[in-house]
Amino acid sequence: MRKISANYIFPVSSKPLKNGIIEIDNTGKITNIIDTKGDLKEIAGLEFYNGILVPGFINTHCHLELSYLKGKIKSHTGLTGFVKQIAKLRDKFNETEIKDKIAKADKLMQHEGIVAVGDIINDTISLEIKKQSKINYHSFIEIYNINSEKAQTSFNNGLEILKTVKENKLKASITPHAPYSLSEKLFEIFKNYYADKQEVVSIHNQESEDENKLFENRSGNLAEMLKNIFKSYDIVSNINNSSLQSYISYLPKNNNVLLVHNTYTSEKDIEFAENYSDNLFWIFCPNSNLYIENKLPQIDIFVRKDAKITIGTDSLGSNEKLSILEELKTISNYFPDIPFSKLIEWATINGAKALKMENMLGSFEIGKTPGINLIENVDIKTFKINENSKIKVIA
């Protein structure tokens, strides 16, 4: 049994506690939360820390499989430039090297106080590491193919990987890569498969301006790249609308849908999407956005629209670290009016809800085992994080 206290505790599900105490058992499960009303007395065995205690972080978007690309991709090349660089490097690393980088990335996230991850996969190379990890993983099995004749084959390949992941007793679901990389037929197969399910799915959304141009009038660098690679492509045929408004009807609305990046999502897009489904979660990976497109989403508009926001790190191919705190620092720097309590909510309970893990993670509540992070070097009076703020994993 441990008794843990700090200047402030942010349970997330309830108001902050000044000099509060969290009691946990040997498994990390919370057995008691004490509101001292700020009057902390000497208690035998009490651990006191300077800073703010928050629940373990939830990383709702990552690509562990791309960890071997750290430092290998040039920044600010735009999405098409990023994709082309990956294509050139993909076959230059062997399985042992890739697994080693995945294992190191997993440990790195644990060190950064991350307790759950929504991880994009294209094969089963990460499964052994995930089985041994302390992190709770939900693997999103990507499907993509813009040739309608190969739609069923592509989906069947996803089903095979899904079967293997489930046999390893890990959480997983099939998920579309991006609106520009699936044929209309593959989208239909995907939607029909999840029509009667209540799962979690994910899709890269409006990561570049070229994505919107592609759907609005078949122009831009992305359209050009697809033309050069494929003689014809059968993507969603709805023209004259933004990307999101063109394809959203193919997303299964009774499932949690994680829309990733949203760098070029407009206010009209948000309204349109929120009217379509109540189960949308908008994932921001700000450091990756700056690395690839050198642009951030209009996060303040999402806040004003009361959208459900979560935080991701993306991969080490487009990020120097896999740290939720570093993502929050970037958001706080560019959007200083967003309160600390809101940022922590996005990084914890919202992510847990998005991945359907809120029963055990995301907030300090009796019976949960959410992990306990200490944020050090934070202004206790203003609750502002800064470039020197850092994470210490307490439990």
Where are these regions (language model features)?
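Active-site gating/metal-coordination segments in enzymes
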Residues: 157-200
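Active-site microenvironment of metallo-dependent hydrolases
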Residues: 1-20, 306, 348-395
